[in-house]
């Protein structure tokens, strides 16, 4: 949208200048500018500050400028940071914001939403909410109770609270960042004052999140200057360096792990293919715990890449931009390694309109056609888009403005570092299906099954998941529900308990299609049963019986014993498909608690909520 005098508070000359400037800015420059403007207004009455050129200013230096500009102002010096996180991204970013504010002398309360005492909410002077959206617009597990409280009649008026929201999501889902949007709207309804605009982050969230953190930090520094601003800025820089120094290899700088093994876990005759990958971490300094995940940067299907290039009659050797600092690669390499081409999103189609001569595409992206848009993008890819909406004026140099970056795929770790030093194991099921007259392939799963050989290098990083962890006390009993590849983290759990000599009972419920061909890690479970590492194993193979049977039926059949384990302090873990399996498993748990605990439906729900708040009911679902 172009700024005009009629749709903005700017003069025609100002609007013209802004319209010329904004398209030329890099993401880094935009983030710098948003943070600078956040504190500029509050610092106007303070002593003038010499501002270096944008390209030469870091986020830490920006905060130092904010502190200097606000030296004449004093305000609250406490901040509450609440996060709701399923895989750990929101929690990591919340910790980063907390470190920055502590470095500037603020008193910081950092808490998962389900651990926060809600009677403290109305006392919060500054409130920062960092939350992801899970599934079909749902809050993460550790945000649900706080979300429900805030949207209930029990929520207090927050007239004295200033807030901002960072929302994480994925534009390939219909309800992109809905949970963050809900928090933003509800806090406003309760009277809280928004001090920085909500930022909605896609899967490539690092830059947008850094910009938001810089903006809210700048606002706080402008409103509540430290006693010694320059010193505080040095502390912030040291704090940031400490955070960044935790690991050389990160999401932004992945480790090239050598593939040691790539095995098919399914037996001959199976209609499924599940790969067991063993990767070397030697020399990386990376470590992980049971429950963590590995982020894998895959390659797109070379055949699909070549089809796209051929359709547009591009030169595969053309140089295109692939990095924020202007790094380039050949067009073919960019489509193989850097850009997403298998998923269509609403933002992608909206951007594509400018390069298409199709009136149908322009009509499809109109707000009133959202149902048709949702139906179209499901199961289609960039090649479909190109074929369906000709003609195109898209040039190879336009890629960075239209396609989003190829996001990493997260896989639950299937090994214990104590059991396999300098290694990490993954369990990946091959995804292939037919849709819209063409065969579709999962980007990472097909890469792993068809094109990845021992000796190859795979770019990876460790994704900590603090919301899915075995009990601190290894003698605590555990109940693990993991059908299919959902069993992966429980191999890590049990290997670790074996290494620690855990005395606690362990119960695994596993399911798949056929016993003979689809019993993943069968020999591991049998050995662990024989050695006493695994106390009880119940299985459900849905295609081996006339009537399909699933893990939730096995739970109900053993309901009395399962409830007894719960009463003895057992922790329950569920991993796998959220839409069907996890929902059915939770329903089975509620039935068991109600029937064998003598509780009403409301009482059973309260019991399960209490387990969740105690960290005794954890889910890693997708």
Q: Model-flagged regions — what are they?
A:
Residues 1-622:
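FNR-like FAD-binding dehydrogenase module
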């Amino acid at each position: 949208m172009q700024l005009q005098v009629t749709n903005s508070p700017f003069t025609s000359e100002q609007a013209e200048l802004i319209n010329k400037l904004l398209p030329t800015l890099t993401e880094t420059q935009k983030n710098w500018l948003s943070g600078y403007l956040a504190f500029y207004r509050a610092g106007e009455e303070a002593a003038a500050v010499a501002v270096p050129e944008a390209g030469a200013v870091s986020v830490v230096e920006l905060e130092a400028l904010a502190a200097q500009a606000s030296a004449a102002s004093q305000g609250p010096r406490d901040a509450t940071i609440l996060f709701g996180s399923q895989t750990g991204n929101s929690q990591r970013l919340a910790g980063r914001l907390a470190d920055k504010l502590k470095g500037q002398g603020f008193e910081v309360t950092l808490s998962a939403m389900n651990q926060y005492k809600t009677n403290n909410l109305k006392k919060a002077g500054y409130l920062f909410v960092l939350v992801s959206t899970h599934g079909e617009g749902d809050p993460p597990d550790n945000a649900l109770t706080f979300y429900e409280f805030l949207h209930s009649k029990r929520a207090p008026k927050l007239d004295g609270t200033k807030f901002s929201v960072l929302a994480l999501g994925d534009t390939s889902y219909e309800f992109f960042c809905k949970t963050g949007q809900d928090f933003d709207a509800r806090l406003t309804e309760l009277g809280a004052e928004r001090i920085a605009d909500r930022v909605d982050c896609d899967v490539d969230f690092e830059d947008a999140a850094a910009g938001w953190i810089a903006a809210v930090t700048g606002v706080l520094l402008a409103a509540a200057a430290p006693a010694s601003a320059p010193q505080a800025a040095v502390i912030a820089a040291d704090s940031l360096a400490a955070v960044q120094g935790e690991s050389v290899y990160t999401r932004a700088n992945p480790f090239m792990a050598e593939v040691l093994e790539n095995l098919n876990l399914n037996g001959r005759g199976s209609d499924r293919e599940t790969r067991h990958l063993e990767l070397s971490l030697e020399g990386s300094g990376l470590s992980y715990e049971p429950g963590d995940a590995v982020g894998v940067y895959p390659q797109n299907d070379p055949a699909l890449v070549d089809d796209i290039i051929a359709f547009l009659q591009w030169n595969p050797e053309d140089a295109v931009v692939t990095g924020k600092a202007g790094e380039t690669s050949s067009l073919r390499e960019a489509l193989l390694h850097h850009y997403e081409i298998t998923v269509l999103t609403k933002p992608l189609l909206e951007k594509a309109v400018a390069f298409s001569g199709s009136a149908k595409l322009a009509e499809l992206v109109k707000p009133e056609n959202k149902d048709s848009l949702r139906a179209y993008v499901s199961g289609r890819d960039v090649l479909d888009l190109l074929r369906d909406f000709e003609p195109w004026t898209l040039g190879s140099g336009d890629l960075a403005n239209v396609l989003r970056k190829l996001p990493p795929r997260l896989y639950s770790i299937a090994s214990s570092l104590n059991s396999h030093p300098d290694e990490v194991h993954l369990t990946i099921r091959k995804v292939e299906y037919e849709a819209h007259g063409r065969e579709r392939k999962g980007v990472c799963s097909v890469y792993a099954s068809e094109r990845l050989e021992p000796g190859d290098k795979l770019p990876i990083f460790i994704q900590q998941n603090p919301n899915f962890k075995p009990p601190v006390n290894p003698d605590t009993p555990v109940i693990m529900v993991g059908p299919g590849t959902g069993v992966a983290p429980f191999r890590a759990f049990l290997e670790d308990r074996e290494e620690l000599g855990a005395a606690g009972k362990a119960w695994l419920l596993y399911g798949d299609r056929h016993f003979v061909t689809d019993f993943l890690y069968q020999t591991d479970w049998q050995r662990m049963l024989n050695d006493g590492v695994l106390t009880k194993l119940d299985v459900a193979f849905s295609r081996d019986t006339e009537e399909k049977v699933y893990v939730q039926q096995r739970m109900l059949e053993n309901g009395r014993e399962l409830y007894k384990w719960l009463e003895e302090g057992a922790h329950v873990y569920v991993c796998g498909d959220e839409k069907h399996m996890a929902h059915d498993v939770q329903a089975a748990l509620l039935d068991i608690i109600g029937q064998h605990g003598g509780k009403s439906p409301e009482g059973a729900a309260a019991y399960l909520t209490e387990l969740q708040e105690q960290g005794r009911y954890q889910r890693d679902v997708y």
